[in-house]
Amino acid sequence: MSQEISEDLRDELAWFVQTYSGIVDFELDENLDPKRWFMPLDSYATRKEAAHYFLLVASLSDYQLTGNPRNIRLLLHHLHETFGKRIYTSTDPVVFKSGVLSYEQKMEIFDRLGQAKGEIPEVLCSVNVFVEKKARGDLIEYADGLFQKGWKPKDFAKELSYSVKRLNKHNKAKCWLYLRWMIRPSPDLCLFQFDPRDLMVALTTPKLRVAAALGLTSNEDMVFELNAKEMPENWWRDTAEFDADADRLNEFARSLFPDDPARVDFPFFILGTWLEYADLTPTFLMKSLRFLNQKHEELLQPLMRYLTVVSHYNRVGEVVPPGAFSGFEFDVYDFLRSKGVLFNYEFMEFCLPAENAGIDRFLTYKPDFLLPQFTDSGRKVILEPHGVGKNLKDVLFKLSVFRKHYGEFFCLILIVPDTFLQNIQNLDPSGNSYDYLWKQSDYKIQFEHFHKS
């Protein structure tokens, strides 16, 4: 049930939002690969295309459809390479089916689409039908027309929820995600004329975690249900309950930023992702906020950023296909898949201070395998297979810096070839670079023991 939120917690949240609201949304970030073919938005034609493209993005922002959010950019890039401008004009799902299938085959050792991936072609076509029939091919002009009539963003959201597949009921949160991108100023796109004060925060699962930790949800068991290993299929179907929770979260957002409540939207996504499978209490929320705010002050930049695809190269300098690129990594990847373990592969990059490393720049660390459902003393587990002997000292140093700054929240398991053990113990006798050190020859047995414990 709703509870009193302390002033200290409100202040930490406001500070966090003010800091992280200047960060470009993961889906809008043009520093990530692959690059969008229509950027920059320096003409009406490119802005018009962006309005259509990002409606496709929002419609696919559904774990059941696309799995990891990075798949959306990668899938649409693949479909554009395959079909060109037909990704905006096709209204026949059959056209897209082959493209979705070829994407999965291409990305087999990188990531997987969601369980409802078979609906992706129909979702894309329903967006195109809406743009063609309702908006007459121009979403910016359509939105401007609604604005001139005195309509509000909620009216546009209602039109979308009636017309586009999987944008109704609880999925209408995706309408608000789209409208936030289209209406808010930079780092959003500001393509529509509506007033940002009329926006709502999209109640997606990460933001529901924040709401639950704040005590804003009506269901007292929500903090436990959000951390269930397997949430039932009907979990989101109580639309009235989640509408009420969305209203409370938005009321809270307006109390922080009355002229721009959706300013909290992406910061709360970041915070809610941090809270995945964590203790959803005000105490742990405050602990996390203080850590994130303090580290940002130290680093003067965000602690982490989300990645799409990280380029790797073979020995002759050629880019290799996305995914677990070494035999060792692929063995771990395949093992985790065979065990049904949920993991994120190279999905996040952490910022690290230089720590007197003799360099004048920040270090970064990209975990190979983050296992969000596994914890060790309340910390999320990272598996780091490393089979390259070159620069081993530098690798151990980077891992030790990561553990020094993030070890309160993450447990790092380093997996290495058996022949590396003695060298690692010589280079790092105190074990500062890992919580656990496993041999390649028996890491599967070690994992089973770890899992049971």
Label the model's feature ranges.
Residues Y313-A324, R337, L342-S377:
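Active-site metal-binding core of divalent-cation-utilizing nuclease and nuclease-like domains
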Residues I415-S453:
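Domain-level recognition of nuclease-like catalytic cores that cleave nucleotide substrates
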Residues M1-S311:
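HhH-family (HhH-GPD) DNA N-glycosylase catalytic core used in base-excision repair
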Residues Q301-D331, F335:
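Interdomain/boundary linker segments immediately adjacent to catalytic/signaling cores
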Residues K393-G407:
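Short, charged, amphipathic alpha-helix that recurs within catalytic cores of restriction-modification
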